[in-house]
């Protein structure tokens, strides 16, 4: 007799199956949208000087002269073998382009996520702990400014203040042009520099990363701070907090041990989803800072109506959302033992 499947494993299987269905729907929708956008991708790729015969040959090679259902079937057949198609814009396999540009965006997104966590949560905790005082008012105003101002505007402001006026940070790029890049082993400049023992490149890469990551993180910092404050203020009204106050527990212990952990569940949920959303929101920040990442690449392929590259880029971003969703659910269940997975006790 086989042992019953654990609730955790059952939940993971259910989520993975649902994720595959979502990815299939996203691929179908984006495939259709990409093909109804006005413009001939073959003509755009070859340029205005190409002959009609050359354009027709490219259409036939890429199945662009076939009905859309046939085109989608051919795409799914290639996708099943790990082939995302070939880019008309770069004339390379889409997976090669994604492998080149994705590490730069992930480096930016992970750094922004770290800033959201390390800045947003403490600001929210302090605002809740000192609610109604001047520190709380400053934190709330700063949070509203962070949420209400677009990321690209923050990028321009940070460039003007810290790059043009004070000259504390570089304006654009991942590394100084005159500095030799470390050997590319992972595509992540920080990791490559650390593995190569190149301290100068590591410091320079961090120097270039601060402003774009901060611009990308500002809205998330504000949202995280506001949600942390609201969750903790609600927790402060619970009877067990009133009992802790009655017993004379120190304010710091009440805030950090008793009020913070219950308030962490909604914060973790939003943080995980915001981290995945940064992949899609990074395109304007990458354009402002000249950051050679996947989001900037996605804008270029949309402008060139590069069909396979459009679908491939969106699939990567959709996969990031789904992975983040599953990871957040697991993390929340670990933080809050009262939450049970599907199939467990409620």
Task: Give the ranges of each region predicted by the language model.
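Hydrophobic alpha-helical transmembrane segments of membrane transport/permease proteins
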Residues: 22-73, 162-201
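Helix-terminus/capping and membrane-interface signal
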Residues: 20-30, 104, 108, 321
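Residue-level signal for discrete positions within transmembrane alpha-helices
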Residues: 19, 101, 105, 141-148, ...
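Short loop segments and helix-boundary regions at transmembrane helix junctions
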Residues: 126-149, 154, 164-165, 227
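Hydrophobic alpha-helical segments of integral membrane proteins
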Residues: 8, 16, 68-84, 94, ...
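An internal, D/E-rich "acidic patch" concept
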Residues: 1-8, 65-121
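Alpha-helical transmembrane segments of integral membrane proteins
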Residues: 6-11, 102-135, 181-346
């Amino acid at each position: 007799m086989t042992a019953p499947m654990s609730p955790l494993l059952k939940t993971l299987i259910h989520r993975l199956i649902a994720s595959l269905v979502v990815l299939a729907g996203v691929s179908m929708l984006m495939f259709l949208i990409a093909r109804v956008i006005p413009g001939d991708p073959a003509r755009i790729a070859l340029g205005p000087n190409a002959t009609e015969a050359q354009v027709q040959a490219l259409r036939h090679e890429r199945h662009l002269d076939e009905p859309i259902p046939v085109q989608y079937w051919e795409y799914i057949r290639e996708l099943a073998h790990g082939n995302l198609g070939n880019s008309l814009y770069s004339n390379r396999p889409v997976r090669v382009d994604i492998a080149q540009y994705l590490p730069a965006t992930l480096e930016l997104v992970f750094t922004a996520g770290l800033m959201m966590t390390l800045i947003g949560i403490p600001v929210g905790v302090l605002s809740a702990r000192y609610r109604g005082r001047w520190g709380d008012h400053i934190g709330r105003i700063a949070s509203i400014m962070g949420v209400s101002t677009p990321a690209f505007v923050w990028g321009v402001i940070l460039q003007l203040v810290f790059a043009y006026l004070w000259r504390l940070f570089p304006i654009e790029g991942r590394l100084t042009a005159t500095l030799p890049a470390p050997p590319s082993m992972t595509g992540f400049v920080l990791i490559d520099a650390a593995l190569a023992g190149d301290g100068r490149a590591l410091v320079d890469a961090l120097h270039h990363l601060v402003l774009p990551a901060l611009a990308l993180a500002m809205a998330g910092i504000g949202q995280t701070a506001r949600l942390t404050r609201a969750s903790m203020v609600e927790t402060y009204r619970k009877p067990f907090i009133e009992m802790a106050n009655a017993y004379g527990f120190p304010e710091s212990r009440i805030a950090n041990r008793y009020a913070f952990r219950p308030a962490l569940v909604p914060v973790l949920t939003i943080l995980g989803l915001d981290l995945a959303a940064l992949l899609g929101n990074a395109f304007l920040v990458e354009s402002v800072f000249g950051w050679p990442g996947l989001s900037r690449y996605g804008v270029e392929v949309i402008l060139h109506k590069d069909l396979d590259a459009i679908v491939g880029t969106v699939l990567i971003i959709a996969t990031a959302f789904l992975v983040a969703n599953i990871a957040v659910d697991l993390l929340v269940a670990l933080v809050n033992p009262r939450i049970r997975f599907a199939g467990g006790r409620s």
